């Protein structure tokens, strides 16, 4: 991730902080575009809290055919709203149990202290049912070849097949159907390991 990207976003956050607190920032975008990396850079730059949408994937009993056929339906956005966005928007502390995809279970609670800025990062962060709660929405994109290269490096070649055949098509359906890039205030293309 190019540090100037994080610096541009941090500058916009500082502008928003002049008008209101707390400021909630969403970072959405394509798989392997650098959403988590950018969130961590913002944590270092401005000391913000970070919540990962990966912690809100559906539990097995929630994965109905109807739900999974809905754009953005494979994330528990209702729980993300109730347990994270609503409390943070009121300046309250957050406590939620992240879902672990490998264990297929909820883990021990994660606590996020209320702060001036919190970043919610991950695919589906800008779902239409959530986007009104953000003060700043950022979209990251990456070219397909680079995306697949990053996924192979991060998750291994076998997992990359599942990403290519299952997760990327679901994300692309969500991005197109929900107008995710268009709803965002800032858009960045990442490349060459940035």
Language-model features: where?
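Conserved nucleotide-sensing/catalytic segment adjacent to the nucleotide-binding pocket
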Residues: 49, 62-105, 117
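Walker A (P-loop) phosphate-binding loop of P-loop NTPases
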Residues: 32
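Conserved lysine of the Walker
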Residues: 35
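Hydrophobic positions on the alpha1 helix immediately C-terminal to the Walker A/P-loop
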Residues: 38
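Small-molecule kinase domains that catalyze NTP-dependent phosphoryl transfer to phosphate-bearing small molecules
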Residues: 105, 109, 127, 157-194
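Extreme N-terminal, non-catalytic leader segments
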Residues: 1-25
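Short beta-strand-centered segment that lines the nucleotide-binding/catalytic pocket of NTP-utilizing
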Residues: 46-61
């Amino acid at each position: 991730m190019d540090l100037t990207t994080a610096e541009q976003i941090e500058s916009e956050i500082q502008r928003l902080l002049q008008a209101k607190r707390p400021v909630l920032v969403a970072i959405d975008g394509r798989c392997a575009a650098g959403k988590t990396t950018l969130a961590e850079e913002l944590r270092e730059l401005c000391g913000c809290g970070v919540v990962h949408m990966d912690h809100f994937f559906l539990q097995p009993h929630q994965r109905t055919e109807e739900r999974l056929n809905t754009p953005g339906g494979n994330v528990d956005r209702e729980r993300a709203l109730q347990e994270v966005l609503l409390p943070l928007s009121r300046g309250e502390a957050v406590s939620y149990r992240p879902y672990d995809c490998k264990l297929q279970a909820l883990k021990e609670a994660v606590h996020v202290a209320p702060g001036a800025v919190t970043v919610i990062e991950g695919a589906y962060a800008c779902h239409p049912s959530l986007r009104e709660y953000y003060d700043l929405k950022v979209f990251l994109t990456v070219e397909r070849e680079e995306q697949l290269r990053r996924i192979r490096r991060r998750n291994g070649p076998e997992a990359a097949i599942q990403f290519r055949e299952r997760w990327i098509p679901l994300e692309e359906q969500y991005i197109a159907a929900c107008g995710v890039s268009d709803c965002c205030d800032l858009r960045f293309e990442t490349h060459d390991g940035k």
